């Protein structure tokens, strides 16, 4: 990291212009000045009357190391010789009211372990990365036409040691990575790792945006974890919260005694539901702080994506009784995405947005927000409401399972079965399923079958892969002892087979963002709650037929229209005995009957399993293997900064 002397920086560059390297100026940097080694401290506090650096080195006496104000807009700086790495410090700020408050450094790259709140001098340089092969491979692929399976996890509660203590970043590399590789997830998505004071905020209420939380080790330890993920072909996505922050006294809130990082207007400053305050996204210094932060994580931690939290809260002012768009936030998000994709055109920028805001994943030059993925919250809500309904009443809400296909290609979507749906009394995915013990497992297998065959990339929260019975308990680890029970082992085996089938089946991901990748066979059988559809790849023979039965009834010799192939194999049946099912499976090879049905050229007669999904693959084409018009399917993408698609 090249440290810039703030006295040489034109004030306009930080206060009025785009300045995305602000971490090179601000914070605590180990430097040599006038042949003396020490630390230069620089901070922005526009309304402070006076500033000091305090720590053990001066017995926390704010009279000793007074900072100099170097711009009228409130940049303060001081070089202190003979201070070394690991020194703890804070800023003592004299407010306009005459009070002295003590604040952690907004740009600190390391902090004390909670409950302590001081910043720590740390030289973030020096980690030797070994992920060039990962970077080369990533550039050769188009994420839009690849399989994507994301394992969402909370670092502190995935697994704990026997004595209840937390695994470190390095220890988690040894524990987590083999597990992720075994399950063939392509990415992990980690709930926020920025420094935060309260464990139960899960990291979403941060105080140190540049500091990887010290709960699990040093910044270099986290770099090692990411490096190891890349070594084994796993991408790393971080939850990132640029919309709001916590009100703890040592953090960003009222940083110099006045609203500094937050809006001044109380009507839009406060988030009463979360007890947080909103970043003032119309302020250039705040934008530079946040966009520099995004690039900092990309450059120094080599992460592969952000899941941007609470975008809906950013897009609209939270004034009671009003729904007015926040143009500051809209402009900020576009600027953020342009900066990110200029840095790395293969990066993942995912919006967690529950609104109907248009063009979230369209490039900014087309009027979009510039993300390249968006969580499909509508799909998640509809599907889970449908699954929680008693099977005999599902026919009355049939449209909840078909509505998503009306808008599935309006954005680049990720289908999230996330942490938000298995906490706060919402029950685990398994326990959402109605019926008896067997029914619950059968329906969860069915849900996963539908999940992996529906258009869109995939995200699953930890524990879902083996059927966690209890909802997520953030102060405990997962119920790993459930592997001692047969039905959970069956579920785990099924999930691994399903994700393996997904990854090796191009029709399930190659045209995720093109309408040509999906065709209903029968979307209207509400009486039996059976859905059938085709997933299609680039080539005609790359096709799968999917049949889902959302009741407990079994149907024999059930006619399903299919494309004109000669034979079909059943490549997966969720009711197979090896997955804990009743064994209502189909013989391996099914001959297609050359009589039209369901607007298809042929049909097969199959057994429809109870609460089951059957996936069929064509064995042999009757004529050719190319699309009739010889064209190549176009897939929607977002390359915000490149001026092309």
Swiss-Prot record:
Residues 636-645 have a biased composition (Polar residues). Keywords: Carbohydrate metabolism, Glycogen biosynthesis, Glycogen metabolism, Glycosyltransferase, Transferase. Residues 619-645 are annotated as: Disordered. CDD domains: AmyAc_Glg_BE, E_set_GBE_prok_N. Pfam families: Alpha-amylase, Alpha-amylase_C, CBM_48. NCBIfam families: branching_enzym (TIGR01515), PRK05402.1 (NF003811), PRK12313.1 (NF008967). Catalyzes the formation of the alpha-1,6-glucosidic linkages in glycogen by scission of a 1,4-alpha-linked oligosaccharide from growing alpha-1,4-glucan chains and the subsequent attachment of the oligosaccharide to the alpha-1,6 position. This is 1,4-alpha-glucan branching enzyme GlgB. It comes from Bacillus cereus (strain AH187). The lineage of its organism: Bacteria, Bacillati, Bacillota, Bacilli, Bacillales.
